[in-house]
C-alpha cells in the first residue's frame, strides 16, 4: 500500500511539473516567442490580459501605446503577436498567411464568404469571380454605375437635402449619419442587385433606422464568438448563451432581410441558368450578382467536386451567393457611411475649406451643381477621381478616422516563419492595425491632427508621397485586401461632390464625434451627427 501511495505521489508530482513547465517555464523561457517583448507581464502565460483589453474596447489605443514603448513586434498573448512595421506587414499580408477561426463570425447562413474563408486558395478562387467588376477601370466606365448613381444622388439624396432647407420647414438639423448609411447601402445594394431590385433606404427613413438598430446589435455581440469560440459553443449547448437573445434575433432578421433580396432575384437566377438574362434598363443591371452567379455556375460545370470551391461554395450555390452578398452589403454600407460622416464633420468645421472644395468641384465639366435651366449631369469619373483637394480630404479622413481601425488577424504557416528578427512557430495569431500604422510619425507628422494638406501634391516630394502611401492601410494590403475599395472611393467622392457642389454645411450637434469607438470598427460614440444645410446661391 505504501508503494502505491509513493507511486501516486510521484505521478502527481510529475503531472504538476509538466503543467508548470508547459504553462509557465516553456512560454516564458523556451518558446520561440519568449524573445519578443511582452506588452504586459502576464502575456506569456495567459490570454486574460488581451481578452480584457478587447472586452473593455481599448485594444487599438492599448496596442499602439505598447508599440511606442516596445517596438514594432510585441507579444500580446501566449500565442499572439501584434506588428506595426512595414516589413512585418509585407511578410504577413503579402505572404499568403491564412485567416484564423476568428473570422468565422463573418460566415453567413452557415457558409463562409470570401472575407471569412480561411484558406488562401479558396479565397483566391472566389475573388477571381468578381474582381473585374470591382476594378477601378470597370467602375469608372460602367453605364450601369453611372445610371444608378444618377438616380440615387439626384432622385433620392439631394431632394432630401433640398427639403431640409425649404421655407415650409425652415432650416433644421439633419442627422447625416443616418443619411450616409442610407446612401451607401443604396449604392452597394443597387450595384449588386440592380436599381429595381436593390434598396431604397434613402426613401424609407423608418426602416433604415430599424435596420441600423439591428446592425448595432449584431456588431455589439461578436466578442465571445470571436475570442472564445469553444466556450461559446459549450455554453450554447448547456443552455447558457453568452450572447443575449436580442442579438441572435437581430442577426436572424438581418439574415432574412438579405435572403429576401436574393429571393427577389430568383427569376433572374433561373434566366441566367438558361443563358438568357432578362432585358431591362441600364440602371437595373445586377452587376455583382451576374458576375458571382455566372462564375459559380461555370466553375461548377467545369470542375465539379474536384474544385477547391466545392465544399463551401459549389455544393450549394444559393447559400454561397447569399452569404457572399450579405457580406458585401453590410461591409459596403458601414465602412463608407462612417467615412462620409467623419468627412462631413471635418468639412463643416471650416467654411473656407468648403469654399475651396466647391470651387474645385464646379470646375468640372459637367459639374454637379443643380440649376433650374439644365438637366442634372454626372461628372466624368476619371476627372472627379483626379481632383486633388477632394482626394486629399478623403484620404486624410480615411487615415485618421479609418472605418476599420482594428487588428486584421492572420495565422503563421504550419512550418513557422520569421517575423523581423524573431522566429515564430506555426499557428500563431498575428495582426497589424490601421490605427497604429496610420499614426507612424515618420510617415504622418503630428498624426493625431486632421491635416488634409499632407496629401496635396504640392506639399510633398515623390519619396514622401511613396512613404505615405506605403503606410496607408485603410483597406489592408496584399491579396486579401478589401475588394470593394475602388467602389467605396468612387461612391464617396460622388456623394461629397453632389453635396458640396450645392450646399454648405454647419455643425448643429456633434456630441460624441471626437470619441471614435476603439475596436475592429470605428464608429462615432453617439452614432449620429446633426448638420444644417445651407443652399449655395
Predicted regions and their residues:
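N-terminal membrane-proximal hinge/A-helix region immediately C-terminal to the signal-anchor transmembrane segment
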Residues: 2-125, 150-152, 163, 183, ...
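Short, small-residue alpha-helix embedded
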Residues: 335-348, 495
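Cytochrome P450 I-helix active-site segment
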Residues: 209-214, 348-403, 425-426, 451, ...
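Hydrophobic, well-ordered secondary-structure elements that form the walls
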Residues: 397, 427, 450, 478, ...
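Conserved cytochrome P450 K-helix/beta-meander segment immediately N-terminal to the heme-binding cysteine loop
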Residues: 432-462
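Cytochrome P450 heme-binding "Cys pocket" and the immediately downstream C-terminal segment
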Residues: 197-198, 351-354, 461, 467-468, ...
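Cytochrome P450 heme-thiolate monooxygenase catalytic core
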Residues: 100-107, 142-340
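Cytochrome P450 C-terminal beta-domain/meander region
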Residues: 68, 72-74, 379-396, 407-431, ...
Amino acid at each position: 500500500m505504501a508503494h502505491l501511495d509513493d507511486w501516486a505521489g510521484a505521478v502527481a508530482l510529475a503531472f504538476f511539473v509538466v503543467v508548470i513547465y508547459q504553462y509557465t517555464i516553456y512560454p516564458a523561457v523556451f518558446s520561440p516567442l519568449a524573445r519578443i517583448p511582452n506588452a504586459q507581464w502576464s502575456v506569456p502565460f495567459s490570454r486574460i490580459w488581451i481578452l480584457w483589453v478587447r472586452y473593455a474596447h481599448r485594444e487599438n489605443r492599448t496596442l499602439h501605446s505598447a508599440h511606442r514603448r516596445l517596438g514594432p513586434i510585441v507579444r500580446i498573448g501566449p500565442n499572439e503577436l501584434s506588428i506595426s512595421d512595414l516589413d512585418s506587414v509585407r511578410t504577413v499580408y503579402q505572404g499568403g498567411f491564412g485567416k484564423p477561426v476568428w473570422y468565422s463570425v463573418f460566415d453567413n447562413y452557415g457558409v463562409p464568404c470570401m472575407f471569412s474563408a480561411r484558406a488562401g486558395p479558396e479565397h483566391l478562387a472566389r475573388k477571381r469571380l468578381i474582381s473585374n467588376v470591382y476594378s477601378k477601370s470597370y467602375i469608372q466606365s460602367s453605364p450601369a454605375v453611372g445610371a444608378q448613381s444618377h438616380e440615387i444622388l439626384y432622385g433620392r439624396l439631394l431632394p432630401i437635402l433640398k427639403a431640409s432647407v425649404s421655407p415650409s420647414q425652415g432650416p433644421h438639423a439633419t442627422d447625416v449619419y443616418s443619411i450616409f448609411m442610407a446612401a451607401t447601402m443604396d449604392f452597394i445594394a443597387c450595384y449588386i442587385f440592380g436599381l429595381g431590385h436593390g434598396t431604397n433606404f434613402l426613401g424609407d427613413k423608418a426602416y433604415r433606422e430599424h435596420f441600423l438598430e439591428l446592425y448595432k446589435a449584431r456588431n455589439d455581440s461578436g466578442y465571445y464568438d470571436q475570442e472564445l469560440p469553444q466556450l461559446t459553443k459549450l455554453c450554447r449547448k448547456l443552455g447558457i448563451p453568452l450572447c443575449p437573445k436580442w442579438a441572435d434575433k437581430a442577426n436572424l432578421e438581418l439574415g432574412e432581410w438579405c435572403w429576401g433580396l436574393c429571393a427577389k432575384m430568383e427569376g433572374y437566377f433561373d434566366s441566367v441558368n438558361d443563358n438568357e438574362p432578362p432585358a431591362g434598363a441600364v440602371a437595373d443591371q445586377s452587376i455583382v450578382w451576374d458576375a458571382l452567379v455566372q462564375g459559380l455556375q461555370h466553375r461548377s460545370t467545369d470542375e465539379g467536386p474536384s474544385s477547391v470551391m466545392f465544399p463551401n461554395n459549389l455544393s450549394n450555390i444559393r447559400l454561397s451567393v447569399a452569404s457572399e452578398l450579405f457580406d458585401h452589403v453590410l461591409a459596403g454600407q458601414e465602412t463608407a457611411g462612417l467615412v462620409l460622416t467623419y468627412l462631413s464633420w471635418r468639412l463643416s468645421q471650416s467654411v473656407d475649406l468648403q469654399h475651396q472644395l466647391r470651387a474645385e468641384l464646379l470646375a468640372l465639366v459637367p459639374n454637379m451643381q443643380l440649376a433650374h435651366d439644365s438637366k442634372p449631369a454626372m461628372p466624368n469619373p476619371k476627372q472627379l477621381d483626379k481632383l486633388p483637394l477632394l482626394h486629399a480630404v478623403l484620404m486624410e479622413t480615411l487615415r485618421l478616422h479609418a472605418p476599420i481601425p482594428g487588428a486584421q488577424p492572420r495565422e503563421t504557416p504550419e512550418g513557422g516563419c520569421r517575423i523581423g528578427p524573431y522566429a515564430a512557430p506555426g499557428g500563431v495569431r498575428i495582426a497589424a492595425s490601421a490605427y497604429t500604422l496610420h499614426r507612424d510619425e515618420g510617415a504622418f507628422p503630428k498624426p493625431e491632427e486632421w491635416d488634409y494638406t499632407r496629401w496635396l501634391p504640392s506639399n510633398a516630394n515623390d519619396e514622401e508621397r511613396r512613404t505615405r502611401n506605403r503606410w496607408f492601410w485603410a483597406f489592408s494590403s496584399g491579396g486579401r485586401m478589401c475588394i470593394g475599395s475602388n467602389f467605396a472611393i468612387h461612391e464617396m467622392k460622388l456623394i461629397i461632390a453632389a453635396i458640396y457642389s450645392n450646399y454648405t454645411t454647419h455643425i448643429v450637434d456633434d456630441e460624441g464625434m471626437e470619441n471614435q469607438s476603439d475596436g475592429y470598427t470605428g464608429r462615432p460614440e453617439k452614432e449620429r451627427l446633426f448638420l444644417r444645410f445651407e443652399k449655395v446661391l
